[in-house]
């Protein structure tokens, strides 16, 4: 288990400082195309960091449970890569950024009907269909089981959020049928869409999400439970996808300015991973125009900068 290169005192201070500085940051609005998400208090704001040696630091509303939403994609992706290997995932779904909005179907039309990325909705629905299962309930059991293994505790679904999403997910149903027509879905299309919607409706806290990210940072072993969740060799593939497409159409800018693999969700959550060191998670419902939490982005970026976590940082002194 690799130790962090940053002291616990510095991490704790960075978390508290980021929460204090960003808690009054304005801008953005709750996702309103999923009715129940529009009702979440917009002032909620939590920040957490989990290290690879099992330390967890929190500030603000870090115990509030929110919908995992699109962040769930990385854990289903990890499950499928673990079961089928990175090559099969790449062949059957793709491993490239689309350059389009997360719910766009343009990539399907422009790239021979292939989803391209497992972190946009089309690719995520396709990835869900690749879970090696004997039926829908087995598929669901494995997906929520993977989320629970990453978090180190039993994760559960919000039936209220799921019902709200199932009542409005017409676009995703259409995507599932497009995938069926092109041959890039691997179970019944409506089963895949239903399970995908369910996986987005599970509840986590920022403390949970930080541990989930720290499991990736720790090479696939949960730093709290000690359980190996995915093979170390499969972690880089997940982190690569997070770098390319994790914060929607802002992914390139995020890599340029923050330099950490990350994944956001329209529930207001965001997780970023510093391999071998720690993960940062933040939550606040108001989103920017592309679907990323305004406060969460600011807090994660501040912590990454304070602790000099960016993957592209070059050690050494500045030249005169």
UniProtKB/Swiss-Prot annotation:
Which residues make up the binding site for substrate? 70, 121, 165, 172, 196, 248, 266
Enzyme Commission identifier(s): 3.5.1.2
Record field: catalytic activity: L-glutamine + H2O = L-glutamate + NH4(+)
Q: Which GO terms describe its molecular function?
A: glutaminase activity
Q: Name one Pfam family in it.
A: Glutaminase
Work out whether the entry's keyword set contains Acetylation: no
Query: At the top level of its lineage, which domain of life is listed?
Result: Bacteria
An example GO biological process term is:
glutamate biosynthetic process
Its keywords, alphabetically, are: Hydrolase
Q: How does this protein assemble?
A: Homotetramer.
Q: Which family does it belong to?
A: Belongs to the glutaminase family.
What's this protein's name? Glutaminase
Organism, by scientific name, is: Mycobacterium marinum (strain ATCC BAA-535 / M)
Organism taxonomic ancestry: Bacteria, Bacillati, Actinomycetota, Actinomycetes, Mycobacteriales
């Amino acid at each position: 288990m690799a130790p962090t290169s940053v002291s616990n005192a510095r991490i704790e201070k960075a978390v508290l400082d980021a929460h204090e500085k960003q808690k009054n940051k304005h801008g953005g609005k709750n996702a309103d195309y999923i009715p129940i998400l529009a009702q979440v208090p917009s002032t909620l704001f939590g920040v957490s960091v989990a290290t690879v040696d099992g330390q967890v630091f929190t500030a603000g509303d870090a115990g509030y449970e929110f919908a995992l939403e699109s962040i769930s994609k990385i854990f289903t992706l990890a499950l499928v890569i673990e079961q089928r290997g990175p090559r099969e995932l790449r062949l059957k779904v793709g491993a490239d950024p689309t350059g389009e909005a997360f719910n766009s179907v343009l990539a399907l039309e422009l790239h021979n009907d292939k989803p391209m990325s497992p972190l946009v909705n089309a690719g995520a629905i396709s990835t869900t269909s690749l879970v090696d299962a004997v039926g829908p309930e087995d598929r669901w059991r494995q997906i929520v089981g993977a989320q629970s293994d990453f978090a180190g505790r039993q994760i559960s679904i919000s039936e209220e959020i799921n019902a709200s999403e199932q009542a409005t997910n017409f676009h995703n149903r259409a995507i599932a049928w497009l995938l069926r027509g092109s041959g890039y879905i691997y179970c019944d299309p409506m089963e895949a869409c239903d399970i995908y919607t369910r996986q987005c409706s599970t509840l986590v806290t920022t403390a949970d999400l930080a541990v989930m990210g720290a499991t990736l940072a720790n090479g696939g072993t949960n730093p709290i439970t000690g359980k190996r969740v995915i093979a170390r060799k499969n972690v880089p593939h997940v982190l690569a996808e997070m770098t390319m497409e994790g914060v929607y159409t802002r992914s390139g800018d995020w890599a340029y300015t923050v330099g950490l693999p990350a994944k956001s969700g329209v529930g207001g959550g965001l997780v970023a991973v510093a391999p071998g060191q720690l993960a940062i998670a933040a939550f606040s419902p108001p989103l920017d125009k592309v679907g990323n939490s305004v406060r969460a982005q600011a807090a994660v970026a501040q912590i990454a900068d304070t602790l000099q976590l960016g993957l592209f940082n070059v050690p050494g002194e500045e030249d005169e």
